[in-house]
């Protein structure tokens, strides 16, 4: 049986990786996935004018599963208030259902 969850997604500049990871850890979230990503937005046009996934200029995408929407919104608010006036980024929340995940669901499973 699936366990309901909230998937918080944060896409921003790679330079913020450690700072955002610290906010997520401090929130009590059980973990996250982070990956390099690229794309184009109002503040994400690289010098070539093309979407970019190079290591130097790459963006990152965090995916965080939370049990409550409140926790997801708390993380989102802290990140946006602290960094998004000076750095490019977008944050969104999706409903999710966890099918398997020892840390999220416990030893008995979901």
Swiss-Prot record:
UniProt keyword annotations, A-Z: Cell membrane, Membrane, Thylakoid
Molecular-function annotations in GO: enzyme regulator activity
Induction statement: By limited inorganic carbon availability.
Record-level GO BP terms: regulation of nitrogen utilization
Topology relative to the membrane: Peripheral membrane protein
Cellular component annotations (GO), alphabetically ordered: plasma membrane-derived thylakoid membrane
Subcellular location: Cellular thylakoid membrane; Cell membrane
Pfam families according to UniProt: P-II
Protein name listed in UniProt: Membrane-associated protein slr1513
Organism: Synechocystis sp. (strain ATCC 27184 / PCC 6803 / Kazusa)
Highest classification ranks of the organism: Bacteria, Bacillati, Cyanobacteriota, Cyanophyceae, Synechococcales
């Amino acid at each position: 049986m699936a366990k309901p969850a909230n998937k918080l997604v944060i896409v921003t500049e790679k330079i913020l990786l450690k700072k955002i990871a610290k906010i997520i850890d401090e929130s009590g979230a059980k973990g996250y996935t982070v990956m390099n990503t690229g794309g184009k937005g109002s503040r994400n046009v690289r010098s070539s004018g093309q979407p970019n996934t190079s290591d130097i200029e790459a963006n990152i995408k965090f995916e965080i599963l939370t049990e409550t929407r409140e926790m997801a919104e708390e993380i989102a608010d802290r990140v946006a208030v602290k960094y998004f006036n000076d750095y490019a980024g977008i944050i969104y929340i999706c409903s999710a259902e966890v099918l398997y995940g020892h840390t999220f669901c416990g030893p008995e499973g979901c």
